[in-house]
UniProtKB/Swiss-Prot annotation:
SUPFAM superfamilies: beta-lactamase/transpeptidase-like. Pfam families: Glutaminase. Belongs to the glutaminase family. The gene is glsA. It catalyses: L-glutamine + H2O = L-glutamate + NH4(+). This is Glutaminase. The keyword Transferase does not apply. HAMAP family: Glutaminase. Substrate binds at S64, N114, E161, N168, Y192, Y244, V262. Homotetramer. Its EC number is 3.5.1.2. One of its GO terms (molecular function) is glutaminase activity. It comes from the Bacteria.
Length: 318
C-alpha cells in the first residue's frame, strides 16, 4: 500500500469513529435524507495515480462545488469582462446573504456566494440558452472523468430546490433591479438549480479537479481546458472565498484552495501535485463539511501539501 493510500485509510478510520459529525442540510429535502455516517475520499496525482477510501464511488449532490465549473465556463466565454458583473473579494457573510447586494448596488462580492453564482448562471444562459447551458456544463465535465456517462443532473433535487429556493429568488430579482440579471429570472434560476443538482462521486470530483491541478489542461488528453491564468484565478478565489465566511479558517487549517458544497463535498487542489475530493454530509455552522474539513486537515498534516509551507512540495508523505 502506498503512503498516500495508507494515510487516507487512517483518516477514514478516524472519521468513522468521530462523535461530532455536523448536521445535514435539512432545507433541501433530498439532502436531509442522506446518511450522516457517509464518508468518502479520493486523491488523484499528477501521474494519474488514484487512491480512494470509504464511499468514494457513491454519487452525491455536489451543490456549490459546481460553482467552480460554471465559473470556468464563464471565464472561457467572457474573459476578464466577467469581472464587471461580479467581484473577486471575500464576502465575510453567509453564502445567501442579501445585505451586501444592497450596499454594493447589485454586484456580488465573488462568484462563489449564491448571488455571484447566479450572475455566472445568467451569463451562461445568455451565451447558450437555458436548456443548452445544462448540456454544455455536462459536456465540459464528462471528458475529464473515466466514466463520463455517470455524471448527471438530479432533476428531482433541482425541482425541490426551485420549490424551496425563496432566498435565491430574492437575490436574483434584487440583482435584476440593478440590471445585473439580464435574462428572465426564472430561466437563470432554472439553470442555477440544475447546476447545483449535479451528482458525482468523490472519485469523479477529484478527476474533474485535475484540470486545475495541471494549470488548465485535461491530464487524460493534454487538451487545454482553460488558460493557465484562468486556472490560477479560480484557485485564488477558491482559497479566498471557497468556504464562505469560513474561508479564512479553512485556509489556516488546511492551506489549500478548496470549494465546499452543502451536500457535504469539498474539492481541494494541491497545484502540480494532487486533486482531492472528500464527502461527509454533516455540515458545520458555516455550511461546510465538518468531517471533510477535518479529513483534509489531517491529510495536509501528513503530506505537507499546504501552500503556506516554505517548501510545500518538497516534503514527502510520511
Amino acid at each position: 500500500m502506498s503512503t498516500v493510500a495508507s494515510i487516507i485509510v487512517s483518516i477514514a478510520e478516524e472519521m468513522r469513529t468521530a462523535s461530532e459529525r455536523g448536521t445535514v442540510a435539512n432545507y433541501i429535502p433530498p439532502l436531509a435524507r442522506v446518511d450522516l455516517n457517509r464518508f468518502g475520499m479520493a486523491v488523484v496525482g499528477m501521474d494519474g495515480e488514484t487512491h480512494t477510501v470509504g464511499d468514494a464511488e457513491v454519487p452525491f449532490s455536489v451543490q456549490s462545488v459546481s460553482k467552480v465549473f460554471s465559473l470556468s465556463m464563464a471565464l472561457n466565454a467572457m474573459g476578464d469582462e466577467l469581472w464587471g458583473r461580479v467581484r473577486q473579494e471575500p464576502s465575510g457573510s453567509a453564502f445567501n446573504s442579501i445585505v451586501q447586494l444592497e450596499n454594493e448596488h447589485g454586484i456580488p462580492r465573488n462568484p462563489f456566494i449564491n448571488a455571484g453564482a447566479i450572475v455566472i448562471a445568467d451569463i451562461l444562459v445568455s451565451r447558450y440558452g437555458r436548456e443548452n447551458a445544462q448540456t454544455r456544463l455536462l459536456e465540459f465535465l464528462r471528458p475529464l472523468v473515466s466514466d463520463p456517462s455517470s455524471i448527471d443532473i438530479d432533476t428531482d433535487v433541482a425541482r425541490q430546490e426551485r420549490e424551496t429556493g425563496f432566498r435565491n429568488m430574492a437575490l436574483a430579482n434584487y440583482m435584476r433591479t440593478f440590471g445585473n440579471i439580464r435574462n428572465v429570472v426564472e430561466d437563470t434560476l432554472d439553470f442555477y438549480f440544475h447546476q447545483c443538482a449535479l451528482t458525482m462521486s468523490c472519485h469523479q470530483l477529484a478527476q474533474v479537479g485535475t484540470c486545475l491541478m495541471t494549470g488548465g489542461r485535461n491530464p487524460l488528453t493534454g487538451e487545454r481546458i482553460m488558460s493557465e491564468r484562468n486556472a490560477q484565478t479560480i484557485l485564488a478565489l477558491m482559497m479566498m472565498c471557497g468556504h464562505y465566511d469560513g474561508s479564512g479558517a479553512f485556509a489556516i487549517r488546511v492551506g489549500l484552495p478548496g470549494k465546499s458544497g452543502v451536500g457535504g463535498g469539498i474539492l481541494a487542489i494541491a497545484p502540480g501535485v494532487a486533486s482531492i475530493a472528500v464527502w461527509s454530509p454533516g455540515l458545520n455552522a458555516q455550511g461546510n463539511s465538518l468531517l471533510g474539513t477535518r479529513a483534509l486537515e489531517r491529510l495536509v498534516q501528513h503530506t505537507g501539501w499546504s501552500v503556506f509551507r516554505a517548501n510545500p512540495w518538497v516534503a514527502n508523505p510520511t
